[in-house]
Curated annotation (Swiss-Prot):
Record's protein name: Response regulator protein GraR
Start and end residues of each Response regulatory domain: 2-115
DNA bind region: 126-224
Residue list for modification Phosphothreonine: 128, 130, 149
GO biological process: regulation of DNA-templated transcription; response to antibiotic
Function summary: Member of the two-component regulatory system GraR/GraS involved in resistance against cationic antimicrobial peptides (CAMPs). Upon phosphorylation by GraS, functions as a transcription regulator by direct binding to promoter regions of target genes such as adhesins, exoproteins, transporters, toxins, and proteins involved in cell wall synthesis. Down-regulates the expression of many genes involved in RNA and amino acid synthesis or glycolysis.
GO molecular function, one term: phosphorelay response regulator activity
Record PTM: Phosphorylated by GraS. Phosphorylated by Stk1; phosphorylation increases the DNA-binding activity of GraR.
Gene field: graR
Length: 224
């Protein structure tokens, strides 16, 4: 597994690199924190570990840049005790978030869970769903409508899959949150709202934002 570790604390970087390499992870770091995207594009990581507080530009800036060109899983690290950091990371499409200090074995477990969720599917099995006049590719986390294609985060795709498998039925927020926790995603009541809003924003790019309806006090419904 190729890991890009974007961490400016060299002591922490070396400690994490050593631990991760013992699990056969191939770890790359950043030499110039003004050119994170250069390393990202040349190394082509399978997962990015991204610190929030960095020199020159913060982790949120680099997450936006990565999301412009890739749907690679991103796990944020933060030493700040600020719940808004977690909300912001969700809004930007991160897959997980950990607050420093943390246990390295928990980080490794999260990385393995993300890898299983994103990459370990049977190559010849193409899982698709049809929704209205769009084709949803569950293995690629993409939605194609006509000539347009959008890409979702894993959390957004799980939410959408839950809703469209129960089309025209109200799905409670608790049901969605429970399913996401079962899938090892990190979602609270507040961040579920963030994810649904972000999902709608992406659907608006293919004129489908009205296909998911909020049922106040009850949950959400995907229309046929």
């Amino acid at each position: 597994m190729q890991i890009l570790l974007v961490e400016d604390d060299n002591t922490l970087f070396q400690e994490l690199k050593k631990e991760l390499e013992q699990w056969d992870f191939n770890v790359a770091g950043i030499e110039d924190f003004g050119k994170v995207m250069d390393t990202f594009e040349s190394f082509n990581p399978e997962i990015v570990i991204l610190d929030v507080q960095l020199p020159k530009y913060d982790g949120f800036y680099w997450c936006r840049k990565m999301r412009e060109v890739s749907n690679v899983p991103i796990l944020f690290l933060s030493s700040r005790d600020n719940p808004m950091d977690q909300v912001m990371s969700m809004e930007l499409g991160a897959d997980d978030y950990m607050q420093k200090p943390f246990y390295t074995n928990v980080l490794i477990a999260k990385l393995q869970a993300i890898y299983r969720r994103v990459y370990e599917f049977t190559a010849e099995e193409k899982r698709t769903l049809t929704w209205q006049d769009a084709i949803i590719d569950l293995s690629k986390d993409s939605i194609q409508k006509g000539d347009d294609t959008i890409f979702l985060s894993k959390t957004e795709m799980i939410i959408l899959e839950i809703l469209i498998t129960k089309k025209n039925q109200i799905v409670s927020r608790d049901t969605i949150i429970t399913a996401l926790w079962d899938d090892e995603a990190f979602v609270s009541d507040n961040t579920l709202t963030v994810n649904v809003n972000r999902l709608r924003k992406k659907l608006s790019e293919i004129s489908m934002d009205s296909a998911i309806e909020t049922k106040v006090g009850k949950g959400y419904m995907a229309h046929e």
